[in-house]
Amino acid sequence: MSNHIVVSSVSYAPVSGTDQEVMEQTHKDLKDLVGRAARATRPDLIVLPETICRNCDEEMPEGPTTQLLASLAREYSCYITVPVHQKERKSGAVFNVLGLLDRQGELAGIYRKYIPVYPEFDHGTRPGPGASLIQTEFGPVGGVICFDLNFGELRAQYKKLKPKLLLFSSMYHGGLVQNFWALDVQAFFVGSVYKGTPCTIIDPQGTTLAQSNNYQSWATARINLDYEVVHLDKNQAKYDDIHRQYGEAVRIVTTGEVGTSVIYSETEERTAADIVDEFELVRLDEYFDWSRQLRTEHLT
């Protein structure tokens, strides 16, 4: 069944100064920026860039930045990421994290940066365990933080977990690697980065749907998380039958050059998986697995 949500990724340029000055200015900026983005786009989810409050290590959920964003999540009734340095109360360990607050301002879950960049280790930041999913009302989501984007093993972990949505919180952009993550994991990718490069929203075929720009500090898109990814081979000949039977209730998006399609359910009566099963479509991973098997059979 269709699962539409509005997602917004917001850019920000962290400030400098004493720890107290940084916190006060950052909190003031966040109230303004999140408020403007939320009023303009009415999002279900807002993604913010990495370690948004510099030198503001805090416990979660009681830390000041977490509490500020929790109040904004409640005010605007949306999920909001919390990109901070989390300090554990018992051990004193520090992690670079992407927390996720729900519409009530409650902490839904935390993703810890898999591989911090080397200066972070010098400052005591510890690595996270790897891919993990945070449960939300619109399905499980995965987190990725900055330098993590470079490591294929983390992407492979997410590929096995099969989230429909990846949240990327970062200092740097990553360029086409963002699009490859979306394509390879077959997930929507919402990237929030520091000002100077665009925030992005990318679909499961690696197509960029929306970007921020020099005039607007956020990117916004309405996306449908009820989808299945298939290859054109063995499937394309059936598309006309699907359209004939279901019309606008099923949307098929085919990206040029890549050789894939995304099947979206646009109705409450059936899921995209139901459509795939009814018309015996072959999912992308199944097609690749079958192709590998076929190769093995023809080696001898």
Residue ranges and their predicted role:
Residues 2-5, 41-44, 75-79, 139-141, ...:
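Loop/turn elements at helix/coil->beta-strand transitions in domains of secreted/extracellular proteins
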Residues 4-19, 23, 112, 140-148, ...:
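Active-site-proximal beta-strand elements of phosphoester/diester hydrolases
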Residues 4-11, 22, 37-39, 45, ...:
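Ligand-binding pocket scaffold of soluble enzyme catalytic domains
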Residues 10-12, 48-51, 83-86, 113-114, ...:
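Active-site-proximal beta-strand/loop segments in catalytic clefts of secreted hydrolases
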Residues 19-104, 172-173, 180, 184-185:
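Cys-nucleophile CN-hydrolase/nitrilase-fold catalytic domain and related Cys-dependent amidase chemistry
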Residues 63-81, 149-253:
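CN hydrolase (nitrilase-like) catalytic-core segments centered on the catalytic cysteine
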Residues 89-161, 170, 176, 184, ...:
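Active-site catalytic loop in hydrolytic enzyme cores
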Residues 226-300:
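A short C-terminal boundary segment appended to hydrolase-like catalytic domains
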